[in-house]
């Protein structure tokens, strides 16, 4: 059994220490070691986007990131999007627009949307579709998801005014 590596990172605003094997994916550690199971395992090869998180301001699929690479980094998972028991406007918009069904892809879409709206608070439909191109949904199709992102952007802009 390989020696475990000690890693320190900030997850959802909280300093977190964990031990991991050098070959463990960040997804495996988030779910199985830290207990953040909101990040879903879909394809486990980076193609579906279900496990999308924000790592140092960029969206990544942690199924393709080694956990040891998280040393000293900041990450946001789906659990870090809401403010306590109050849903984030993105989450609320996904509910109101029925932009989810089975829920496997939803955390990845919401996290990717958060990163998009942090970078571009008023994206065009084309920009939304481009940004979310690496997130796949087999249930709802994409129109409701795109509408949810547009509505969330409008709500968030109104909150800043």
Spell out what each predicted region is:
Residues 1-161:
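Signature of N-terminal electron-transfer/Fe-S-associated modules in redox systems
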């Amino acid at each position: 059994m390989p020696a475990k590596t000690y890693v320190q990172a900030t997850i959802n605003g909280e300093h977190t220490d964990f031990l991991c094997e050098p070959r463990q994916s960040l997804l495996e550690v988030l779910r199985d070691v830290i207990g953040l199971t909101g990040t879903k395992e879909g394809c486990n090869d980076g193609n579906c986007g279900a496990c999308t998180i924000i790592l140092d301001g960029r969206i990544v699929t942690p199924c393709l990131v080694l956990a040891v690479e998280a040393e000293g980094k900041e990450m946001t998972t789906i659990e870090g999007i809401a403010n306590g028991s109050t849903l984030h406007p993105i989450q609320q918009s996904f509910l109101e627009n029925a932009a989810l069904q089975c829920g496997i892809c939803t955390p990845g879409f919401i996290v990717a949307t958060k990163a998009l709206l942090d970078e571009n608070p008023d994206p065009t439909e084309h920009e939304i579709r481009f940004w979310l191109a690496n997130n796949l949904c087999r249930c709802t199709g994409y129109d409701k998801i795109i509408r949810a992102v547009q509505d969330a952007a409008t709500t968030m802009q109104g909150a800043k005014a």
